[in-house]
Amino acid sequence: MSDNTTLAPPAASQAPATPRKGPPKFKQRQTRQFKSKPPKKGVKGFGDDIPGMEGLGTDITVICPWEAFSHLELHELAQFGII
């Protein structure tokens, strides 16, 4: 065998046939879009339909915000960012 037939490794400066891409980049949405509408304040079933409470109406001052959403579950309040 002759000394002129040595195998040389490929040049390091050669780029691969397909360039490697990094992981896909996701953009953060500025606003959150919900498929359903957020709940409205107020207790379901409270108002003029209660005997003896006709004159009070449905405009009730809510001391605790939890009272305004007492008809909802905790996961529903968390879904819309109320709690």
Swiss-Prot record:
Signal sequence bounds: none
Low complexity bias: start-end ranges: 1-19
Tree of life domain: Eukaryota
One Gene Ontology term from the biological process aspect of the record: visual perception
Catalytic reaction list: 3',5'-cyclic GMP + H2O = GMP + H(+)
Any one GO cellular component localisation term in the record: photoreceptor outer segment membrane
EC number annotated for this UniProt entry: 3.1.4.35
The entry's keywords: cGMP, Hydrolase, Sensory transduction, Vision
Any one GO molecular function term: 3',5'-cyclic-GMP phosphodiesterase activity
Positions of region (Disordered): 1-51
Matches recorded under InterPro entries: PDE6_gamma, PDE6_gamma_sf
Compositionally skewed regions (Basic residues) per UniProt: 22-43
Record's keyword annotation contains Hydrolase: yes
Hydrolase as UniProt keyword: yes
Subunit: Tetramer composed of two catalytic chains (alpha and beta), and two inhibitory chains (gamma).
Family in the record: Belongs to the rod/cone cGMP-PDE gamma subunit family.
UniProt note: domains: The C-terminal region is important in conferring inhibition.
Stated role: Participates in processes of transmission and amplification of the visual signal. cGMP-PDEs are the effector molecules in G-protein-mediated phototransduction in vertebrate rods and cones.
Stated name of the protein: Retinal cone rhodopsin-sensitive cGMP 3',5'-cyclic phosphodiesterase subunit gamma
Organism: Ictidomys tridecemlineatus
Lineage: Eukaryota, Metazoa, Chordata, Craniata, Vertebrata
